[in-house]
């Protein structure tokens, strides 16, 4: 499992333009399984903890509304960054990815992220 997580960080950080940070967090426990940031002032672990609240709020909203839907991802566009919260098909974890909006293409980023997370989806 550790190898799969490390491969995910390596592939994403080396191949997604504008990469800032990435983490993988279990939804039920809130435990961050792996995290990486290329910016010293970007606290990815703290961001992951708060993004867990975003995920739980959205899941609760869907439940309260009685929607028979699954959340695939949540995209948050900031002034200079794009944050993507990609939820696993089994709902057990989410990948949080932060990218520089001036350097990244969101469609390419999401396509590559889906490609690189395939092994993780199979392992968890």
Predicted regions and their residues:
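Non-catalytic interaction/Regulatory regions outside core domains
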Residues: 1-124
């Amino acid at each position: 499992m550790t190898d799969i997580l490390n491969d995910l960080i390596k592939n994403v950080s080396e191949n997604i333009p504008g990469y800032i940070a990435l983490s993988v967090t279990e939804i039920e426990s809130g435990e961050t399984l792996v995290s990486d940031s290329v910016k010293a002032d970007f606290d990815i672990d703290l961001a992951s903890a708060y993004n867990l609240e975003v995920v739980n709020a959205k899941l609760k909203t869907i439940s309260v509304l009685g929607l028979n839907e699954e959340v695939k991802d949540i995209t948050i566009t900031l002034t200079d960054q794009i944050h993507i919260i990609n939820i696993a098909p089994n709902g057990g974890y989410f990948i949080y990815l932060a990218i520089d909006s001036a350097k990244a293409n969101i469609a390419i980023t999401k396509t590559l992220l889906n490609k690189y997370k395939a092994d993780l989806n199979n392992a968890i």
